[in-house]
Amino acid sequence: MTIINSISSLGKISNKNKSQNNLNGINNSNSSSNIQGSNQNTGIVSGLLEIVRGVVLALGVVVGAIGL
């Protein structure tokens, strides 16, 4: 269940980045391009961390159930 939540949150992050890109397209200054790039990287990294966290939690539940 956590993995499904992680994937859905990753989709929300990518949608947020698309709207950020649209806003930055309206304002064509160099500084807004830099902000756009950092926002995209942060979204990708946090989405990947959410997926890793979900996998670790799932493994913890499995190991706990088996009793290793």
From Swiss-Prot:
Top-rank lineage group of the source organism: Eukaryota
Family: Belongs to the UPF0519 family.
Protein name as annotated: UPF0519 protein A
Upper lineage: Eukaryota, Amoebozoa, Evosea, Eumycetozoa, Dictyostelia
Annotated gene: sigN137
